[in-house]
Amino acid sequence: MILCLPSRPRSATTAASACFLFAISVASLRGQAPVFSEDFESGSLNQAVWKTTELGNATVTVQQTQVAHGKSALQIHYPQGEKSFAFVVASHLPDAVRNHFFGRAYLYISPTMPAGHDVLLNAGTPGYPISNFLEIGASGGKNVMVSYQQNAANIPRNETLARGILYPVGRWFCLEWEFQDHPDRVTTWIDGEPAGELKDFVVKPRAPRAPKADPKAKADATETAPMPAAALQTEVAGTDLVKGFSDFSFGFHAWGAGAKEDFDIYYDDIVIDTKRVGPAK
């Protein structure tokens, strides 16, 4: 049962968000549930939990045809030729996962991802893609690529990455990860095995400003107005770069070449917690 006890009048959205936070916090304290979980079994997106971010013709739906467990899963559909993005974003999670957390999701890639820089999930500041975040994506549409992306407005651009193993395609697989902001670090596992890791890095600016939100622009595209030389960032250690995870996003974004054919990314059984989650039981 979920209890909601507002101390003063509030909007329906604010009340729903507070109710959501209260429910997951109490469950966590009792040891009955992780900090956050979503299995999509309601058959639709809970608007008190998720907001949808879409640009172009990529779409987000909850469907019942391709599922890992239960009867429903999230589908990101990407049409041929598109360079757009579509994500579901949770932004009301407790402070317990603001600087360090573990995650797990079941993914299904069909039939494959487009070549280039692909984004699957990330956590960072609001306003994606003009934001700072840690990311799990793909390199060349095939290999795990983990990265720190410094894309917020009016600061030097940075992209620091590491490549890992090949993604499975045409089947469900269990993706686990650990995101940490002090120091900044990304660790991933696929079906329980190490898949890719980014750690012990330094920030080396690549461009004066962040990329434009236009998905047709390259990831390192720059604004026309240059930043003053004094504002350019010197090389710094990779720690406290994100400055806290406030938005947790799941979906797909193709920065590079457009898709050569229609494809779909499915998500199921998403969990975020303060300890490693492991496979669904």
Where are these regions (language model features)?
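Extracellular, beta-strand-rich glycan-interacting domains
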Residues: 38, 262-278
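Secretory/extracellular carbohydrate-interaction modules
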Residues: 76-149, 273-275
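Short, aromatic/His-centered strand-loop micro-motif at the edge of beta-sheets
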Residues: 150-174
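Bacterial N-terminal signal peptides
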Residues: 15-27
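Flexible glycan-contacting loops in extracellular carbohydrate-active proteins
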Residues: 200-265
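N-terminal secretory signal peptides that target proteins for export/translocation
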Residues: 1-12
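Localized edge beta-strand/strand-to-loop motifs within extracellular or lumenal beta-rich domains
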Residues: 171-187
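Extracellular glycan-recognition surfaces and repeat-rich motifs
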Residues: 44-76
